[in-house]
């Protein structure tokens, strides 16, 4: 594929050089027409809508800062390099990035930003960004305005932390003038997920709940990308999850439930993040072990933080990295379930 892409680029370059030579022989009017066409084809200015308003980017950004999750993945996948991106604190590599970004990250080109407690606005400004990409985030309007004072900021378009991986990809692509390339990335990942669904008929219509269990219990809502991608593979949300979503008036990506209420979201398949207590303690717990999914073997307990992160931060780079790691566990749980 790399060889083919190189050939295409070479061909396009040759055409551009030929066009330039011909243009040099033309009239001034021809040159002006070609200049106008070139400006139009660049795709700028572009205006993108977000939950706080509109963001206009007047020219192709060269210095890119990403915030929140996943935006840097799309930037890398589109052949660009961010000058700044968040430092990873959950399941990081030694360099402080995600496992699927490890082969692309270059610390001499990209500054890692500590965004755990609050945004380091001065450090972000010092990077002199042309654009700030945050399509999968949850900051408030005051933060958005501060960031927008530094550079045009592409924020999330709907509820916090619930932008689909497809929309994240498209927003970043449009912001960088690479919409067509972004659409190709989306098609590639969508085709891969369709292939997974076709190769795993045991997933079809099995009810599923995705949650984090331990000291506190969280259930991820249908609008969360980690749930959406499982739906795309063929699973459907457990009735208890759908019922819980009806109470989700604030449109949060997850809801806390008491341990006594965990049975209300039981399903054919339970994807359980148990990195806080470990798989053995989870399975030995009298409440969790009483669940239908656990009794039948329909539970997929996950405690590796990098793999959990890959399932949670759904992107065009994380999906190819994580699928091979989770499909055996998902398949085993779905095959064992009594749904």
Where are these regions (language model features)?
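A short, structured surface patch at a secondary-structure boundary
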Residues: 71-123
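Proline-aspartate-enriched helix->loop->beta-strand connector
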Residues: 121-124, 128-134, 152, 262, ...
């Amino acid at each position: 594929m790399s060889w083919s892409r190189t050939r295409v680029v070479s061909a396009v370059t040759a055409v551009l050089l030929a066009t330039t030579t011909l243009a040099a022989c033309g009239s001034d009017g021809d040159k002006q027409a070609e200049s106008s066409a070139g400006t139009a084809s660049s795709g700028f200015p572009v205006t993108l809508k977000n939950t706080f308003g509109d963001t206009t980017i007047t020219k192709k950004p060269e210095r890119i800062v990403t915030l929140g999750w996943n935006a840097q993945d799309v930037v890398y996948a589109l052949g660009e390099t961010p000058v700044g991106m968040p430092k990873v604190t959950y399941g990081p590599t030694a360099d402080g990035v995600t496992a699927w970004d490890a082969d692309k990250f270059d610390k001499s080109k990209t500054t890692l930003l500590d965004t755990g407690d609050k945004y380091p606005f001065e450090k972000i400004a010092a990077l002199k960004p042309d654009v700030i990409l945050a399509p999968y985030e949850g900051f408030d309007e005051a933060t958005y305005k501060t960031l927008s004072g530094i550079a045009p900021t592409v924020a999330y378009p709907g509820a916090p932390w619930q932008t689909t991986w497809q929309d994240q990809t498209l927003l970043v692509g449009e912001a960088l003038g690479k919409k067509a390339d972004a659409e190709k990335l989306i098609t590639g990942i969508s085709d891969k997920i369709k292939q997974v669904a076709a190769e795993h008929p045991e997933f079809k219509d099995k009810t599923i709940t995705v949650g984090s269990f331990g000291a506190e219990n969280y259930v991820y809502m249908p609008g969360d990308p980690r749930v959406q991608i499982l739906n795309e593979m063929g699973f459907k949300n457990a009735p208890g999850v759908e019922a819980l979503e009806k109470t989700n008036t604030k449109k949060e990506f997850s809801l806390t439930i008491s341990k006594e209420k965990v049975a209300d979201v039981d399903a054919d398949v339970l994807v359980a993040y148990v990195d806080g207590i470990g798989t053995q303690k989870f399975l030995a717990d009298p409440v969790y072990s009483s669940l239908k999914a656990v009794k039948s073997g329909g539970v997929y307990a996950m405690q590796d933080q990098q793999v959990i992160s890959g399932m949670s931060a759904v992107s065009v780079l994380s999906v190819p990295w994580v699928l091979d790691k989770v499909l055996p566990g998902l398949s085993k749980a779905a095959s064992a379930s009594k749904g």
